[in-house]
Design a protein with these regions (language model features):
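Acidic/aromatic-lined carbohydrate-recognition and catalytic surfaces
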Residues: 2-198, 202, 215-280, 402
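Hydrophobic residues within beta-strands of alpha/beta enzymes
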Residues: 59, 208-210
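Flexible loop/turn segments at secondary-structure boundaries
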Residues: 67-68, 114-116, 159-160, 209, ...
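Generic enzyme active-site microenvironment
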Residues: 107-108, 209, 274, 330, ...
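Glycoside hydrolase catalytic-domain groove-lining segments
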Residues: 236, 309-326
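Loop/helix patches that line or flank the sugar-binding groove of alpha-linked glycan CAZymes
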Residues: 3, 16-18, 221, 226-248, ...
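Substrate-binding cleft/loops of secretory-pathway carbohydrate-active enzymes
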Residues: 116-126, 267, 272-307, 377-389
Length: 478
């Protein structure tokens, strides 16, 4: 048997989020309170007892800001308000207060890499090169051939540049053209977001999940990325992205200056600052969440692997020495097929997902459940004619409405859901599972209850061991 090996980066001073479990709410699909088919803040409020009884500690809510919804809310037109489809600021304040009364904290999704093209800043920027907000965004003259300024491609495919015909300049967008990237080398943008953070912190939020955290600052010279493979503009968006070594459009070290600044602000409020740190390399993740920056970052590799023990162990062990308690673990999200679907479907996929969440819960860091994971949900079935995702049809299945009860609408809405999908089976609903000893919900609730009785899982180092036989992942804490 191999000698045990100890693992885990040095611990931060203990904060409220150590030893907690998070829960992601995709607001459009969680609970609709008014029958318009769209989940809303009051709907979340009305389900707080469910979340508290499940045993989670904080709730990350996806964007609810005013938005044209080109990318379902990740195109923000006003960072300090609530879209009427989701409610009002008063509804938000009520949600935060009610959550605190139940021992829950609300984390909001902050989208700082880009705004909507409908944001007043960008509207003003379009009025001309001398406008007050022109430098809030990234503009450049055409390249020598009259086309885009460089070879950057967007994550959703195609060039990362769109021509503003009125001025003859291009603006940069890492995602959709409706999502122009903000210029984080402009101190005015930095100051705007200081105010935005304080606006929500003063309303009592428990912290922020930073969208696209690794991409804020771009190369100041706008240099082209090295091309490492053939680029075909008609290819799959991932193939287009992987044709380049992204040295200049993402992961610039100056982003850390922003995160250190936000860390100081959040520390004033004892708020949790975590990032969507999309990096497949453990060292790359560690570089995104150094000890003096964001309090934590998601490790996404488990969302992109098959169920194979050696590979799974490597993925789990890889970042622990480097990142330790700053890790956030998740089996699913609103951007990937649900893990039971990925891991074989049916009860096999559900069992594997539960095992993965048990592993996450026993490792350094913070596990986060995606809504419905506790019910063992596989991807919902969306008829071809009802597909809505403008970017990737594979995301609709994980975004179908939460099934609260049997029958039409599955208790999500009294109207027609924004995303049409097949009705869930009765035994997939929360109504059928809560309180049933052998249900998936009861298994997850039991896991979370057990975590509260095992302080070694928070305070003791991790020791990897040889399982002694077969394909086994083995370790101990304490």
């Amino acid at each position: 048997m191999d000698e045990p090996t100890q693992s885990g980066a040095g611990a931060d001073t203990r904060r409220w989020w150590h030893g907690t479990v998070g829960y992601q709410v995709y607001i459009r699909s969680f609970a609709d309170s008014n029958g318009d088919g769209i989940g809303d803040l009051i709907g979340i409020h009305d389900r707080l007892d469910y979340l508290a009884d499940l045993g989670v500690d904080f709730v990350w809510v996806t964007p609810f800001y005013p938005s044209p919804m080109a990318d379902w809310g990740y195109d923000v037109a006003d960072y300090c308000n609530v879209d009427p489809r989701f409610g009002t600021l008063d509804d938000f304040d009520t949600l935060v207060t009610a959550a605190r009364q139940r021992g829950l904290r609300i984390l909001v999704d902050l989208v700082p890499n880009h705004s909507s093209d409908a944001h007043p800043w960008f509207r003003d920027a379009l009025t001309g090169p001398d406008s007050d907000h022109r430098d809030y965004y990234i503009w450049a003259a055409p390249g020598p051939d009259g086309g885009p300024p460089n070879n950057w491609v967007g994550y959703f495919g195609g060039p990362a540049w769109t021509l503003d015909e009125a001025s003859g300049q291009y603006y940069m967008h890492l995602f959709l053209p409706e999502q122009p990237d903000l210029n984080w080398r402009n101190p005015a943008v930095v100051e705007e977001f200081d105010r935005i953070l304080r606006f929500w912190l003063d309303r009592g939020v428990g912290g922020f999940r930073i969208d696209v955290a690794g991409a804020l600052v771009k190369d100041d010279l706008l240099r082209s990325n090295p091309q490492i493979g053939p680029w075909d503009p008609t290819a799959d968006r991932y193939e287009q992205w992987l044709a380049f070594d992204h040295l200049h459009d993402v992961f610039q070290p100056e982003s850390h200056d922003v995160f250190r600044r936000w860390r100081a602000i959040c520390d004033e409020y004892d708020a949790y600052l975590l990032g969507e740190t999309y990096h497949q390399d453990p060292q790359g993740l560690a570089d995104l969440v150094p000890g003096d920056g964001m309090h934590g970052g998601f490790w996404f590799a488990p969302m992109h692997i098959d169920w194979e023990v050696d590979k799974l162990r490597r993925v789990l062990a890889g970042p622990i020495d480097l990142v330790g308690e700053r890790l956030l673990w998740a089996a699913g999200s609103h951007d990937v097929p649900r893990s039971p679907t990925r891991f074989g479907g049916g009860d096999l996929g559900r069992e594997r997902t539960l095992v993965l969440n048990v592993l996450f819960s026993c490792l350094p860091g913070v596990p986060v459940l995606y809504q419905g994971e506790e019910l063992g949900l596989v991807d919902g079935r969306v008829p071809e004619e009802a597909v809505l995702d403008p970017v990737d049809n594979g995301r609709d299945g994980c975004r179908t409405p939460m099934p609260w009860a049997p029958g039409s609408g599955n208790g999500f809405t009294s109207g027609e859901a924004w995303l049409r999908s097949e009705q869930r089976a009765d035994n997939e609903t929360a109504h059928a599972q809560v309180g049933e000893p052998d249900s998936w919900h009861s298994r997850y609730a039991g896991l979370l209850a057990a975590l509260g009785t095992l302080p070694d899982l928070v305070y003791e180092p991790l020791v990897w061991t040889d399982g002694g036989y077969g394909p086994v992942i083995a370790y101990r804490r304490g």
